[in-house]
Amino acid sequence: MVNIIQDFIPVGANNRPGYAMTPLYITVHNTANTAVGADAAAHARYLKNPDTTTSWHFTVDDTEIYQHLPLNENGWHAGDGNGSGNRASIGIEICENADGDFAKATANAQWLIKTLMAEHNISLANVVPHKYWSGKECPRKLLDTWDSFKAGIGGGGSQTYVVKQGDTLTSIARAFGVTVAQLQEWNNIEDPNLIRVGQVLIVSAPSAAEKPELYPLPDGIIQLTTPYTSGEHVFQVQRALAALYFYPDKGAVNNGIDGVYGPKTADAVARFQSVNGLTADGIYGPATKEKIAAQLS
């Protein structure tokens, strides 16, 4: 168990919106702050700065966890406006300060996530990276090994191992009675000589339950209408397209991911269709869904 310190952002602060929330997701971030001393306590102080506009629920370092918001209130951390990332997910920042132990901070975050999943009946499939909501490359230190990170939460049946100094993929494979090829497949490792200390590896076959669809896609047809169609199903299409670099409005707030199927989203769909051999009509339907899913798999 890791010590959790409640240090809430003051009521009425700009970054404590106070909207009621029933958590359906857990969103994982890295702080992207490598400064010495940039631990959980430092981020708690930062969130109380009157000029700070963002907020999240927990910051985790290698020794402790700070809670900044009650879990029945939302924060501004996911970059999707009033979408489910901000309004229905618990935001967790993992510290990467130079004087901390990132592997231990990651393990502490996994423990916290497992605890929150049990308390709020949140499935492992609904533990998502910040990138899921807005396309931002976050958590930057975990995206390449996201499946391993989730397996380490303990929501499934896979065994995991943290790479130590002197380990090789061959020695790890031998220790767990598996092959190097299996370790490469389970952990998306192209070069077996490139593993790093602190990396979390899956060392037994992942179950299907541990491989949730990162970018779920809606069924049916979505097209330009008056008024514009909006909702979570549009967010899903926009996030998936952004993951393939077909942004609704690159450079705009959240790259145009706003949950509204307007002309710019229809254009992103048409651009995707054009380069994938489909009729470029800007209408999302079964054929477009199939192509997007294939590109993401």
Swiss-Prot record:
Chief location of this protein within or outside the cell: secreted
Cellular localisation: Secreted
E.C. numbers: 3.5.1.28
One Gene Ontology term, aspect cellular component: extracellular region
Top-level EC class: hydrolase
Function per UniProt: Autolysins are involved in some important biological processes such as cell separation, cell-wall turnover, competence for genetic transformation, formation of the flagella and sporulation.
Protein name, as recorded: N-acetylmuramoyl-L-alanine amidase XlyA
Organism whose genome encodes this protein: Bacillus subtilis (strain 168)
